[in-house]
Structure formats: C-alpha cells, structure tokens
Amino acid sequence: MNIKKLILVTLLLSFIYCEQTKKQKFVLEINNFQTDIEGKKTDLYQLKNEKIEVYITNYGARIVSLLSPDREGIMGDVVLGFKSIADYQKAKTPYHGCLIGRYGNRIAKGKFKLNGATYELPINNNENHLHGGPDGFHNQVWEVIAVNQNSIVMTYVSKDGEMGYPGNLTVEVTYAVNGNELSIAYKAKTDKATPVNLTNHAFFNLAGEAKGSINDHLLMINASHFTPVDEGLIPLGEIQSVEDSPFDFRRAKTIGRDLNQQVSDIQLSRGGGYDHNFVLDKESQGSMSFAARVVDPKSGRQMDIFTEEPGMQFYGGNFMDGSDVGKYGTKFEYRASFALETQHYPDSPNQPKFPSTILNPGETYQTKSIYKFSNSK
C-alpha cells in the first residue's frame, strides 16, 4: 500500500471512529418492548432526523429515550427510562416519560362534584388522587394509528367510569420531530362532561440519563406567580407572586441555589423542594408561548419549552431514592432529574377560581407543547 492510500485509509477510519463516538452507546433492544398486555401488543418506535432521535413505546404512550447533541456534537440521552416493558411495570415511579391522564397532577381527597353528581376516584398519593389513578393512561396500551420516521399518532379510549371518571373519552396524541424540536399534540372528545388535564411526565437530565444531580442546571421559568400548596401538595386556591421567594425563576438561576431555604420556606418544606405549579405569563390564554429554559453548563445542552397550557409543574426529583435503575444501569438517585409538566392547574375541579378543565360533549380538547433542543458553544 502506497503512502497516499495509507493516509486515506487512516483518515477514513478516524472519521468512522469519530462518528461512532459522537453517539452514546445504544442500549435498547426492540424485543424487550414487544410483548402482549391483556391481548394488546406493545412495541418500540423510533422518530429521527438530523438533529434529534426519540424512542417511543405505546405502553403508556411514553418517551423512552431522547438523544440530542452537546456542545461537542456528542449525542446523549437526556430522558430517564428503562430497558424493557417489564422494567416500566415494576418501577417504583411508574410515570417515566408517559402520557398522564385522565387528569394530570392531584385531585384533593379523590373527589369532585360535576353537574350535581359527586365522583370518587382512587386514592393513590397519601389521601389524594394523583395522575389519573393507579391504572391511569400511563398504565394502558395505546393503539398506534399512524407512524413514520418523523411522527407517531396513538389513540386510547377511556371508558365511562374508568378510574371513577365520567364519560367515554377518546384521546389522541401525536409525537413529532421537526428539526431540533419534539412536539406533543393532544386531542380528546367525550360523550359526558368530564375533567381532562393531559401532560407528559418525562424526567430530564441534560447531562445524560441520571448523570449526577440536576441542581447545577440553570433554569428560567416564564412565570410571575405560582399556586402555593398545603401539606398534601393540594393548591390552597391562591395565586401567589414569586417576588422575593425561592420560586422566582424569571431570571435564570441554578435549580439548587435556594434549596437551602427548604427549612425556612414553608412551600419548599411542604414539597421537599420544588413540586409546584407555576402560572405562566401569557399574552392570551391558549396561545403558544415560551414557558421555560433549562441549560446544563457542563454539556452545553439547552432545552426550551413552549406551550398552549396556562401552567407548568416543576418537579425537582425530590422523591427519587435510587430504587429504580435506568436503561444504562444507573440508579435514579435523589434529584437526578427534573420534570416540567405543561398543564392546567392541580385540583381545578375543586377550585372555582382556576381555569376550567371540564370538557363537554361536542367540544374538542386540544393542546400542544414543544420541546426545543440546542447547545451553547
């Protein structure tokens, strides 16, 4: 082999090596997601373009993995998840990456009144109802009705009386990648008045799945107010200013900066840190607007969130304790991830001052949120 050929081969091998090392080692095996749950088939689907790569399963309509580049161009998985359907089913925290419904967040004492009737829901979070109950949408197999390289559409029919909720509710969700964005679009229709509050519960760590604490991440939330809570994390019914409080994220600060006030600040104390709904600043209700920005200074990864929803729950991983082990073999330790759940406010069916979450027959529930990924050089 002459010198020129040797140089070309060396350069080619170097290029191939560099391209391979620009992506985190892939650990998902599709057969671990292909199973049968009560006669319904589950599977794993890939959405991909030149910017981001997303893996979705129809079990819980959930995000399993999301890869985006850091400042060096190295693709890393920024969503916590598991290697198999079996691992999702046995996880201590059952909500990883899933679509939450019929009602995201908490409903006080699992009760609400609607059109003269009182409805009782399963209690699964101390004395309250959380995330649609133990067999909420996160625990259901969704039907895939369309899928291609850039999007997937899934549907689920929640029967009248399921988890105590009234009405047959037909839900549709579309996950789509466009450039460096992942969008989630929700639709729902009912044949009887019912509360509906859908969201996605992805747990993020922009350094990579469970790569240390998220307390050094920089966070900005476009919210001048939040909804304070009682000891059970049920809203008190007030809209409170974030001014001069640990809840002021209008200018970016590290997530952990004010956590030393957890003893002195009653709201941080009640949440064990941040687990609160923020009232987003919007020009008009229902408009698509900027909600939050998160930056990991070490990797340079940045995530911007836009939503049509009026609120967003910021959860700082306060209840993670290492019980769950993720797809890369890493324990999900205390504050190893955060969630930013676009939503209507918690307990709205019992809070007349909050924006209504009641969907009536003939109406269409429709909302969309966008997650935009970039990196700082």
Task: Please report, for each region that a protein language model flagged, where it lies by residue.
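Bacterial Sec-dependent N-terminal signal peptides
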Residues: 1-25
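An exposed, glycine/acidic-rich loop-and-rim segment of catalytic or binding clefts
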Residues: 19-377
